């Protein structure tokens, strides 16, 4: 469960290390984002040689959350951290690698490229 102001790790090799959520599209009633939601983030810390630069604003998709995600079969899945993958304007990943596991819900939301690059899908 991600809200405005939440700090998140990046799960790709775009160069950003830490980002902050600054917007959740969906109107005034959309207060929280969960796995598979696209949010607006700003880069808070980045490596100097990376594509993503500190202070820039990007779209990102949430791939892991500490808050558990309910599955239709009654099971729950949660991760150790909150993580996102940075996206370009066409909603494609900026990085070429995905680090760590991603949730299976991304496949049903249409992020096939992220699921195929991920080392593990939970």
UniProtKB/Swiss-Prot annotation:
Belongs to the universal ribosomal protein uL14 family. CDD domains: Ribosomal_uL14 (cd00337). It holds the Pfam family Ribosomal_L14. This is Large ribosomal subunit protein uL14. InterPro entries: Ribosomal_uL14, Ribosomal_uL14_bac-type, Ribosomal_uL14_sf. GO terms for cellular component: cytosolic large ribosomal subunit. HAMAP family: Ribosomal_uL14 (MF_01367).
């Amino acid at each position: 469960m991600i809200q405005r102001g939440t700090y998140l790790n990046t799960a790709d090799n775009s160069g950003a290390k830490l980002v902050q959520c600054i917007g959740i599209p969906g109107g005034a009633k959309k207060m929280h984002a969960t796995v598979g939601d696209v949010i607006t983030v700003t880069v808070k810390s980045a490596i100097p040689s990376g594509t993503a630069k500190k202070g820039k604003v990007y779209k990102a998709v949430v791939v892991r959350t500490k808050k558990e995600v309910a599955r239709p079969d009654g099971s729950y899945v949660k991760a150790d951290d909150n993580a996102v993958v940075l996206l370009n304007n066409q909603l494609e990943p900026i990085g070429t690698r995905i680090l760590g596991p991603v949730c299976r819900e991304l496949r049903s939301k249409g992020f096939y490229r992220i699921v195929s690059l991920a080392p593990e899908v939970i």
